């Protein structure tokens, strides 16, 4: 009977993955025997085990806390990569004017694409009932419709993949006890934001399917909803990447000086400016403002075009006037690259770790590359490959800005 009870336990504790999680010598009582009452453990005896490891009543053994942090950090890094992919694919979908090809939304039903000719004809007939076909694409063939349909379908399926990448591992890590109390709150917020993002995407598409007051208005999604959709995706991306970097990268113990504090604050402001510039790109895309003035540095024949304030009230121009929207994006882009340049030279005046210097240098190089891509996209009348690369560059620039912020973060005492 003893053999049946204790042999599996011995084999379990003898596995290589658990040898570091238990003491080499079993704790004994004062009398030297191995009875049920144990002496208090010496400090550090279980220093590699998380606070939930080997608790009574648990059927599993938790990973060491540092190992669990690395696993969770890598998971969030992968998640941020999937969000970046969704943003890039969504940008290409917008550039190819494919976003309004799927005129309804079903969480499960639409996962199966049409297969027969009859199903494709039925899908095409649904599309023909909406303004985009009637005004812009009335001579579209079925083959052309299939292309834009598959573009939107790919974006939607990728969005579902993003949801699974967040929710399923989150549930697993929660059950295993690998999430600290602080991480649990963050992970819940991230999963909630993923679900909100999906609903916001359909809310955006609906705006492009509605009949406009003027029957000759170009069908397009609301630039406000497009900016909200992109903005929430960027927030999700930044939050995931920041948490991942905080878990994976060891913190630098930097000497807190006035110069370091100023550099840290300036890095935060620069990252915010980069975020705002990327967000303004949604208004440029939503209004096709990149096709208004295709010259640089001037806009047409002047530095400040005359049609900046054609709408009334004046505030409407900031969000609805294509000329003003392009002008704002130019100004924000120039302000961003200027801020990155100043940040780089400020970082050179302070003794910083090598990894932090690499982040600052990479940020500078990416900023000027992004400006070059933006100017080229403008001068070449927004070709899809170049415009998609420019959008991807904004994500790369934002990522490195977050990396530099993470390098400069204050170490808690």
Curated annotation (Swiss-Prot):
The keyword Transmembrane helix applies. It is found in: Mitochondrion inner membrane. It is an enzyme of class 1 (oxidoreductase). This is Heme A synthase COX15. GO terms for molecular function: metal ion binding; oxidoreductase activity, acting on NAD(P)H, heme protein as acceptor. The gene is COX15. It catalyses: Fe(II)-heme o + 2 A + H2O = Fe(II)-heme a + 2 AH2. It is a multi-pass membrane protein. Residues 1-70, 175-186, 251-271, 348-362, 406-413 are mitochondrial matrix. Catalyzes the second reaction in the biosynthesis of heme A, a prosthetic group of mitochondrial cytochrome c oxidase (CcO). Heme A is synthesized from heme B by two sequential enzymatic reactions catalyzed by heme O synthase (HOS) and heme A synthase (HAS). HAS catalyzes the conversion of heme O to heme A by two successive hydroxylations of the methyl group at C8, in a reaction that involves matrix ferredoxin and ferredoxin reductase. It comes from the Eukaryota. Pathway: Porphyrin-containing compound metabolism; heme A biosynthesis; heme A from heme O: step 1/1. Heme o binds at residues 155, 229. Heme b binds at residues 329, 390. Keywords: Heme biosynthesis, Iron, Membrane, Metal-binding, Mitochondrion, Mitochondrion inner membrane, Oxidoreductase, Transmembrane, Transmembrane helix. PANTHER family: CYTOCHROME C OXIDASE ASSEMBLY PROTEIN COX15, CYTOCHROME C OXIDASE ASSEMBLY PROTEIN COX15 HOMOLOG. InterPro entries: COX15/CtaA_fam, HemeA_Synthase_type2, Peptidase_S1_PA. Residues 92-156, 208-229, 293-326, 384 are mitochondrial intermembrane. One of its GO terms (biological process) is heme A biosynthetic process. It comes from Bos taurus (Bovine).
């Amino acid at each position: 009977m003893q053999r049946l009870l204790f042999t599996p336990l011995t084999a379990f504790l003898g596995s290589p993955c658990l040898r570091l999680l238990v003491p080499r010598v079993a704790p004994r009582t004062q009398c030297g025997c191995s009875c049920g009452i144990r002496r208090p453990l010496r400090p550090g005896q279980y220093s590699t085990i998380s606070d939930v490891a080997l608790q009574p009543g648990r059927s599993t053994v938790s990973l060491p806390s540092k190992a669990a942090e690395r696993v969770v950090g890598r998971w969030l890094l992968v998640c941020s990569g999937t969000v970046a992919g969704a943003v890039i694919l969504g940008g290409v979908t917008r550039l190819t004017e494919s976003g309004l090809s799927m005129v309804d939304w079903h969480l499960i039903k639409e996962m199966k694409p049409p297969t027969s000719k009859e199903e494709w004809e039925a899908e095409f007939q649904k599309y023909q009932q909406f303004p985009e076909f009637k005004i812009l694409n009335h001579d579209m063939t079925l083959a052309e419709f299939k292309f834009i349909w598959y573009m939107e379908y790919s974006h939607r399926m990728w969005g579902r993949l993003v949801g699974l990448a967040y929710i399923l591992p989150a549930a697993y890590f929660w059950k295993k006890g690998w999430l600290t109390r602080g991480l649990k709150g963050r992970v819940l917020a991230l999963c909630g934001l993923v679900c909100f993002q999906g609903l916001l995407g359909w809310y955006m598409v609906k705006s492009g399917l509605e009949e406009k007051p003027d029957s000759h208005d170009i069908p397009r999604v609301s630039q406000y909803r497009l900016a909200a959709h992109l903005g929430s995706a960027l927030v999700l991306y930044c939050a995931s990447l920041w948490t991942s970097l905080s878990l994976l990268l060891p913190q630098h113990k930097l000497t807190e000086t006035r110069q370091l504090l100023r550099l840290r604050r300036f890095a935060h402001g620069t990252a915010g400016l980069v975020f705002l510039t990327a967000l303004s790109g949604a208004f440029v895309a939503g209004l096709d403002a990149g096709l208004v003035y295709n010259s640089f540095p001037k806009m047409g024949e002047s530095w400040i075009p005359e049609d900046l304030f054609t709408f009334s009230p004046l505030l409407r121009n900031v969000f609805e006037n294509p000329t003003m929207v392009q002008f704002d994006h130019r100004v924000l882009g120039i302000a961003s690259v200027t801020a990155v340049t100043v940040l780089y030279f400020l970082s050179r005046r302070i003794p910083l770790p090598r990894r932090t210097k690499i982040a600052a240098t990479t940020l500078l190089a990416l900023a000027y590359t992004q400006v070059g891509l933006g100017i080229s996209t403008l001068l070449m009348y927004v070709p899809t490959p170049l415009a998609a690369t420019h959008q991807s560059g904004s994500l790369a620039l934002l990522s490195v800005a977050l990396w530099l912020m993470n390098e400069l973060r204050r170490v808690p005492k």
